[in-house]
């Protein structure tokens, strides 16, 4: 997966994109990540997490 490309397209930091993708691959949902994993996402909103997911 090209985390750098996703980060560029979404305008988000690559570090957080990588962590969101890892959480998604582990089976976490967008609402769960945006509510309960703010420390891993740098405080991304549910819309931003969904952008990474798509």
Segments (PLM) and residue ranges:
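Long, charged, helix-rich clamp/arm modules that form nucleic acid-engaging surfaces
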Residues: 1-54
């Amino acid at each position: 997966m090209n985390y750098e490309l996703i980060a560029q397209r979404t305008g988000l930091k690559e570090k957080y994109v990588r962590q969101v993708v890892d959480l998604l691959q582990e089976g976490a949902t967008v609402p769960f990540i945006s509510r309960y994993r703010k420390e891993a996402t740098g405080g991304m909103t549910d819309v931003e997490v969904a952008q990474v997911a798509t």
